[in-house]
Amino acid sequence: MRSVCLSLLLILLPASVLAFEVDHWPDGAFGGQPARLNWQGPVPVPVTRPLTLCALYPHLRDAYWLSVNQGMVEEAKRLGVTLRIHEAGGYGALAEQRQQLQQCVSEGSDAILLGAVSYDGLDEAISASPLPVFGLVNDLPAGLVKAKVGVSWYQMGWQMGQWLAKRHPAGSPPVTVALFPGPQASGGNNFVEPGFADGIEGSAIRLVTTARGDNSREIQRTLVQQTLARHPDLDYLVGGAIAAEVAVNELAQRQRDRPKVLSTYFSHGVQRGLRRGKVLAANSDQMRQQGRLALAQAVCLLQSPEAGEQQCPRVMGPPILTLEAPLANPTDSLSDGTFRPVYRVGVDASGN
């Protein structure tokens, strides 16, 4: 009888409060095998106890962070939360992000959601903040933040490496690959590289070069051009979404179908590339859903600081998808085509 009543309750619940499917790391770090969890999330914030959140992004100049942005905006509106968003201007803007951590305090925020520009360059600034800090997308050292939403970027690299390794196992003809992980020592790149290396270990794949650089189209295009010139017989080019997108364009201009292009993360351009057969495979860490989850996690723990892991998971993220075809429904991964950056939710023109 109890199970029947529960089933009826779930049917009657509006879709907006049904569970998120998440990977959950109860030991507090993005390592090892996560547990799959259906998490209902918090209830909307009562008007008598308003919450103001401050989110800091490395930048908003690519599809990845734009998709995170839309997810956060959607969830802030659903939960009735005031949200202010600041972008640092790039992964080199460490000083700017330190200043923005202080700005969140001066704006009267209740908590900070930090998309960090550095894994370990913000330790002192985070520890000095009087506000609870939540990790957003980019990992931070264990114990430094109250909780975090993201995925294992080691796993992102490993899954792409494994996809290739299964295609070219040991004993098959050798193939070459170039890796374009993005900026040196920033975001998830510290973890993608070793993950990819471990993923291809023991296979017929030989990594001939790793080309690191800022995630701007100009820099990634230059790196791709240099690599194609130095390795004209390259079999695979594996990189972040921007590297994959510019590689597709470069190959089209040169009327070449090699190297084959794979993307370690997702974007609108990568979705188009999969649809047209120009991108062979890609990961999606469902970044729009990460934005929703980050907002929901912060609200959950601000409402219930002593809650257990089942009620408010401290380290979680959406499952990583490895795709060989375009997503039929990309609304958990990509922002809408008409969406533009939003910096304020529930804040009037005067900033209040």
Regions found by a protein language model. Name each.
Residues 53, 72, 160-204, 209-210, ...:
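An alpha-beta-alpha
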Residues 14-16:
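N-terminal signal peptide c-region/cleavage motif recognized by signal peptidases
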Residues 36-40, 83-107, 209-230, 244-246:
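Structural motif
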Residues 30-42, 51-71, 75, 79, ...:
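Extracytoplasmic "Venus flytrap"
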Residues 119-155, 166, 267-280:
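Flexible loop/hinge segments that line or gate small-molecule binding clefts
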Residues 148-175, 220-221, 266-270, 285-306:
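Hydrophobic alpha-helical segments within soluble ligand-binding/sensing domains
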Residues 20-49, 289-352:
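Hinge/cleft segment of the Venus flytrap/periplasmic-binding protein
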Residues 111-130, 196, 213-273:
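Hydrophobic alpha-helical
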